[in-house]
Amino acid sequence: MLGAALRRCAVAAATRAGPRGLLHSTRTPGPAAAIQSVRCYSHGSQETDEEFDARWVTYFNKPDIDAWELRKGINTLVTYDMVPEPKIIDAALRACRRLNDFASTVRILEAVKDKAGPHKEIYPYVIQELRPTLNELGISTPEELGLDKL
């Protein structure tokens, strides 16, 4: 999104420039130029952790979620620079179960392990928190399936 905002600013600046380019502009920037630069960098208020978690839990708890939306949500969630909270993963696993998509459950758990990176205590904590859900839904972890040895 930042790249698009910067491109919009560059295009706006180029359209305001004179015939000889930006350095030799015939017009002096007025108050609108200051407003334009502020708009290019404002993205609204920051989302709190609780709002972020609630947004994703709500997304995965949609009763009419389909397989494409599930995969899109998982892919988007994996791109963030963080390990999702267990309650988000719980909602995603339940959505997988509603859709009978076992492959996605394994993929989610593998992604969580990968996102934990060198912090070896995170993945066991997440599995510990998810153990009741995993047992309830009949989901095996990648380690239980022997996928960690491949």
UniProtKB/Swiss-Prot annotation:
Entry PTM: In response to mitochondrial stress, the precursor protein is ubiquitinated by the SIFI complex in the cytoplasm before mitochondrial import, leading to its degradation. Within the SIFI complex, UBR4 initiates ubiquitin chain that are further elongated or branched by KCMF1.
Pathway recorded for this protein: Energy metabolism; oxidative phosphorylation
GO molecular function: metal ion binding
Phosphothreonine: modified positions: 141
Keywords: Acetylation, Heme, Iron, Membrane, Metal-binding, Mitochondrion, Mitochondrion inner membrane, Phosphoprotein, Transit peptide, Ubl conjugation
Annotated positions of the N6-acetyllysine modification: 87, 113
InterPro entries the UniProt entry points to: Cyt_c_oxidase_su5A/6 (IPR003204), Cyt_c_oxidase_su5A/6_sf (IPR036545)
GO biological process: mitochondrial electron transport, cytochrome c to oxygen
Transit peptide feature range: 1-41
Pfam families tied to this protein: COX5A (PF02284)
Motif (SIFI-degron): 2-17
Bilayer topology term: Peripheral membrane protein
Subcellular localization: Mitochondrion inner membrane
Gene Ontology cellular component list: mitochondrial inner membrane; respiratory chain complex IV
Subunit structure: Component of the cytochrome c oxidase (complex IV, CIV), a multisubunit enzyme composed of 14 subunits. The complex is composed of a catalytic core of 3 subunits MT-CO1, MT-CO2 and MT-CO3, encoded in the mitochondrial DNA, and 11 supernumerary subunits COX4I, COX5A, COX5B, COX6A, COX6B, COX6C, COX7A, COX7B, COX7C, COX8 and NDUFA4, which are encoded in the nuclear genome.
Membership in a protein family: Belongs to the cytochrome c oxidase subunit 5A family.
Free-text function comment from the UniProt entry: Component of the cytochrome c oxidase, the last enzyme in the mitochondrial electron transport chain which drives oxidative phosphorylation. The respiratory chain contains 3 multisubunit complexes succinate dehydrogenase (complex II, CII), ubiquinol-cytochrome c oxidoreductase (cytochrome b-c1 complex, complex III, CIII) and cytochrome c oxidase (complex IV, CIV), that cooperate to transfer electrons derived from NADH and succinate to molecular oxygen, creating an electrochemical gradient over the inner membrane that drives transmembrane transport and the ATP synthase.
Protein name as annotated: Cytochrome c oxidase subunit 5A, mitochondrial
Species of the source: Pongo pygmaeus (Bornean orangutan)
